[in-house]
Amino acid sequence: FYSNAGIMYVPFSKTKEGLESTLATNYFGSTYLTLMMLDLMKNVSSSRIVQISSIAMYFIKEMRYEGLEDESIYSPWTWYNYSNLYRTMFSFELDKKITNFETDVVVAHPGVTRSRLYRRSNPSLSYKIIDKFKTNVSTGVAPVIEASTAAELEKERVYAPKIIHQYGKP
């Protein structure tokens, strides 16, 4: 099962439940779907949940758990980063807790790829610089395939493109 939800750089808005939209989509939505799938997967031999995250999680320097619905401190980039860090943390914790299942939970991120996710990005100089480092989608999907098919899994590893050596815990 691949758990992947992503919106990025969207203007501030809230869901009808009062959740900020980026966190609602990227974290709460994918977490809810993953938990709903667990019941179906628990009896499947050698099943695997691959959580798709983002290199953006590595840019969080200070954890924030409160005020995430506050428009006055909203930053599209930062909230995207938080949503991916929370998703990764959830996945690591879920993998520890479902020891009675035959299901593993792993995390992979594609690096910075040329995909439609950037269609709303800011055309500023910093984004033009980032654009120079984007890889093609086939390079980005390699860590997802590795996380999906590896015979031996490393616990709490983030599978990432080898070209940028982004491994380990965020």
Where are these regions (language model features)?
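Hydrophobic residues in the alpha-helical elements that line and stabilize the ATP-binding pocket
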Residues: 1, 33, 90
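Glycine-rich NAD(P)-binding loop of the Rossmann-fold in SDR/ketoreductase-type enzymes
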Residues: 21-29, 82-83, 135
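Short alpha-helical oligomerization interface
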Residues: 10-25, 72-75
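Conserved NAD(P)H cofactor-binding loop of Rossmann-fold oxidoreductase domains
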Residues: 4-10
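N-terminal Rossmann-like NAD(P) cofactor-binding module of classical short-chain dehydrogenase/reductase
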Residues: 2, 23, 50
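Conserved catalytic-core motifs of eukaryotic protein kinase domains, centered on the activation segment
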Residues: 11-15, 44, 61-63, 118-119
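Amphipathic alpha-helical dimer-interface segment in Rossmann-like NAD(P)H-dependent oxidoreductases
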Residues: 25-46, 57-62, 95-96
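NAD(P)H-dependent oxidoreductase Rossmann-fold/reductase module
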Residues: 6, 49, 54-64, 68-170
